[in-house]
């Protein structure tokens, strides 16, 4: 089956920026993560989303994809040493698919033998953090389900006191040979042994604990240190804490994916924090000194007289620590001047007096040109 377009998978245009691609990935990865979404196809969709993001978030890979699509000439054919130009031959019909013809002639040679050492599978774990935990980091213990080597048989899969033997079907080679008539003549066909699955081993008496697999499912506690400054959708790799390797291969890795809960007051953009604070009309007009909450405690902020709504103030170094240790972000404070909606008669009278005494001062400064244009428009001078 042809692979879907990566841009279509993430739901972004081909001109999408890195930030747009990142936001789309975060949203979809949370929606389809197997730990959250129990739909039968969620794991496959999550894998598809992750693959698309890995390509489109890398400038070099994205450039190659934009030029060649899935038929990237840098890709190899069949996972082995044969250079196939990166083309998908799966749709070739007539002899059961182009890959089948190659396998018929050459057997399963290009593919990695099942009996060789292989790295264990990686494990993914979704962790929810509060806004503050993500900013400052924390140490915690998590419990993950994973497959581990069976203690009863020490991973051999055989009942204690017995041992695996050479597979009687393939005589320990892991492959079976047969002849086949094709339009090109009779050829020798080598395939993975269906009895031992390519391992070359046969287990006469299986281990009662693991049923012959050599592995059992367990839940393992792992102590992890979350660095300060992690953001929503980011991953932390814990090397060697995935599933055990196969046939002496190294263990896989653990990937912790972070979901950061939104904050009721702060918003985050990278290492910077944004917040809005209300000002009364009097505070904005006369100036004031107010207290602003930050992640590091309350700080005093001086509001100059004549401050307009939407004015932004920066509190240097009051943002989030950079997760890679490159300094600290800032906090941006945006003021909103609140217009009173319920006034007493006395307050209304004072405001009218204020307006009378103010004269045309409202039309001075940067807003004066705007009001002058409005005045001319009403007079037909514009």
Swiss-Prot record:
Annotated organism of origin: Geobacillus kaustophilus (strain HTA426)
GO (cellular component) term, any one: cytoplasm
Residues the entry annotates as binding Zn(2+) 1: 150, 153, 207, 210
Pfam families: DnaJ (PF00226), DnaJ_C (PF01556), DnaJ_CXXCXGXG (PF00684)
Location of region: Disordered: 154-175
ZnF start-end (CR-type): 137-219
CXXCXGXG motif repeat copies, ranges: 150-157, 167-174, 193-200, 207-214
General function of this protein: Participates actively in the response to hyperosmotic and heat shock by preventing the aggregation of stress-denatured proteins and by disaggregating proteins, also in an autonomous, DnaK-independent fashion. Unfolded proteins bind initially to DnaJ; upon interaction with the DnaJ-bound protein, DnaK hydrolyzes its bound ATP, resulting in the formation of a stable complex. GrpE releases ADP from DnaK; ATP binding to DnaK triggers the release of the substrate protein, thus completing the reaction cycle.
Names of required cofactors: Zn(2+)
Binding site for Zn(2+) 2: 167, 170, 193, 196
Domain of life (superkingdom): Bacteria
InterPro entries: DnaJ (IPR012724), DnaJ_C (IPR002939), DnaJ_domain (IPR001623), DnaJ_domain_CS (IPR018253), HSP40/DnaJ_pept-bd (IPR008971), HSP_DnaJ_Cys-rich_dom (IPR001305), HSP_DnaJ_Cys-rich_dom_sf (IPR036410), J_dom_sf (IPR036869)
Record-given protein name: Chaperone protein DnaJ
Bound cofactor: record note: Binds 2 Zn(2+) ions per monomer.
UniProt record similarity statement: Belongs to the DnaJ family.
Cellular location(s): Cytoplasm
Keyword list, A-Z: Chaperone, Cytoplasm, DNA replication, Metal-binding, Repeat, Stress response, Zinc, Zinc-finger
SMART domains assigned to the protein according to its UniProt record, in alphabetical order: DnaJ
UniProt-listed Gene3D superfamilies: DnaJ domain, Heat shock protein DnaJ, cysteine-rich domain, Urease metallochaperone UreE, N-terminal domain
